[in-house]
Amino acid sequence: MSDIVFIIGFNHDSNCYLINKNTLVDTGAGQNKDYLFSKLRENGVEPEDIELVVNTHCHFDHIGGNHFFPNAKIAVHKLDAIPIRNEDTLGTAGTAFGFEGVNNSRVDIELEEGDKIADFEVIHTPGHTKGGICLWDGENLISGDTIFAGGGVGRMDLGGDYQDMKSSVEKLMRLDVKNIYPGHGPTVENNGKDHIKLSYSYL
């Protein structure tokens, strides 16, 4: 199993996850650089040690800090690469929250279902956005804004779709998930599958 370090987000930031000291999942909204860097350093990692940034989807609160890591490759699902490259503030939800520019248009790697990142497999989970993904290693689910602790799911009014979300949660229900590492809020330990079932019951 990969080593996962939870970096809790605050204000507009998403949660971020450090994997194996060289991969960062999501980078927050880009407003708290000193905080993010301090958390990396607490775990013995310098910002320039990050070789890969994986964005779980294209919204500004998950991609806003991508430019903090100019030496890292930026990876996102191919469907969410489009609004990022186009600097589409509607598609990245920046407009909805008063952020008129995300300052992040670079995508180096277009991810697809089944791609591998360290010990994780990419699972395409549209619903919150067209190109939302989760990362799954047989025990741990880094869920982005698809699933949250307590049965929550990502909002579907900012480029999402209800039927896609329902299908994505159905897909996740087939996994024997132990721990959930969501895009916002607390993590789930030991009974992740129960939280996914609860999410489905709310849809």
Please annotate each region the language model reported.
Residues 100-134:
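Internal catalytic-core helix/loop-beta-alpha segment
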Residues 30-31, 121-124, 129-203:
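Metallo-beta-lactamase
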